[in-house]
Amino acid sequence: MVNVDKLRGKIVEKRMSIADLSKKIDIDKATFYRKINGEGETFSIREVDAIAKELNLTIDEAIAIFFSQFVA
């Protein structure tokens, strides 16, 4: 499960919207919303990598956002 609050916070820090980010990583906006809300498939490794690059996330930030349930 994605830590939605942290992801949204990073998106806002970069002065982007979810629509902007989804377009940059080539994911349909509705699909992106479903994935962050846990409705259906999770993000693929390729998608996590693309998001991390667009938002300039550190490894620790990416882990906290995308893998927090596995680490905690």
Q: Language-model features: where?
A:
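Short alpha-helical DNA-recognition segment
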Residues: 15-34
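Residues within the helices of the helix-turn-helix
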Residues: 8, 19, 49
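Short, charged recognition helix plus adjacent turn
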Residues: 6-9, 14-15, 34, 41, ...
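Short, basic-rich loop-to-helix N-cap that marks the start of a DNA-contacting helix
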Residues: 39-50
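Absolute protein N-terminus
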Residues: 1-3
